Amino acid sequence: MDIQTLRSEIKAWERAYADKHGRKPTPKEVKADPIAKKYHLYNKFKKAESAGTGPSTPKRASKLHSSLNYKPVSFSVKTPEKQISKNRRRSVSKQQHADIVTPSHRSLTFSKAPALSRTPQKQLQDTPKAATPKPSPSVPLGPTPSIHGRVVSLLEGLDGTPVKEFATPGNVSTPVKVVSITSETPTNKPALDVNDEFTTPAYLNRISVDVSPFEKRLSFAERIRQSVVESPIKQMSPEKELSPANQTEEYDDDEDAWRELEGLPPKPKEPKIVDVTFDGEEPDELDEIMGTVEVHNPYDEPVQDDLDWVHETALEGETALSAPIYKEGGIKKRKHQTQKRTTKKAIVRVESEQHKKAKVDNDNFSTTNRLNTGFKVNMGQKQWASRFKK
């Protein structure tokens, strides 16, 4: 029994056991089965093969050789006999070439050229006609090119194709158009000795900036600024702290945002106190000059009106709930709250006879003064002139 057959039978039994039990057999199970004899025989063959005394596994023939029925090539070495005659010399020259037989599917046979022995052989040249004549350029060529009866090509026996001579000043040549340097296509490489406005300055090239993935989003100018700040050559001053006024404004903004979130009314603004100083005259003298003239400034109005508006807005809900209730036909109904007045209330009064008479007397006052003094002076002018008297 061959070792390959034993191995295939053992593998087939192991696969069948694994399909049945779901696992490979253990050594105890192998010994309990009749397949143990084949295991023992397989190990015996393996030991004999490793020692080199037992039967060896035959090598597998390649597919190419098996398909062509390849057989080892046999070479036949024949020693040529000495032949003196002319016909015999021709036959020897033919036998020196290897006869190659067309390979068939059944067998391949090759005949090797005669081996060269180390012992020198006698030359088989009896007459000088056996030597191959060298071609001579003086031999005339006939209609069919041939040299000593051997057909040659048209160019054989010649020295070669003549080489074209280079143009010399004496020879006539076609004039070549001279290309001017200014008409050449400019190259992309700029001149090194020309100061270009687009080139990077040298002091920027000397600065080594390690760009991190976060700093790649920054501009080039920002990266240069950071490198200058971090360099020990020049230290920039730290950022200035905010002034108290700016800190107060930030605090007020935060407080307003908190009030909006809580639903509280906005914080009332405090009136600004401005100290006004006068150069020259004192405030008392200025009051005497100006008199009782009052200048209306809308920004000087008190803030109390704004506070009242805030309280009224906050109490609108309570006022609506506390509105009086009226009874109509035994059904209680709450009075609807109307819109708040947006215009100033005007009081219309009817003039009496006494007011009309006093108005007529005031109109006639200017006429009487004009007749007595010769000047037209009304009551308003008199009051304004009396203020500037000392």
Curated annotation (Swiss-Prot):
Signal peptide: none annotated. GO terms for biological process: DNA replication initiation; double-strand break repair via break-induced replication; mitotic DNA replication preinitiation complex assembly. Transmembrane segments: none annotated. Coiled coil: none annotated. Residues 363-372 have a biased composition (Polar residues). It comes from the Eukaryota. InterPro entries: DNA_rep_checkpnt_protein, Sld2. GO terms for cellular component: cytoplasm; DNA replication preinitiation complex. GO terms for molecular function: DNA replication origin binding; single-stranded DNA binding. Pfam families: Drc1-Sld2 (PF11719). Residues 353-362 have a biased composition (Basic and acidic residues). It is found in: Cytoplasm; Nucleus. Residues 134-143 have a biased composition (Pro residues). The keyword Ribonucleoprotein does not apply. Keywords: Cell cycle, Cytoplasm, DNA replication, Nucleus. Residues 46-148, 232-256, 353-372 are annotated as: Disordered. Belongs to the SLD2 family. Has a role in the initiation of DNA replication. Required at S-phase checkpoint. This is DNA replication regulator SLD2. It comes from Yarrowia lipolytica (strain CLIB 122 / E 150). The gene is SLD2.
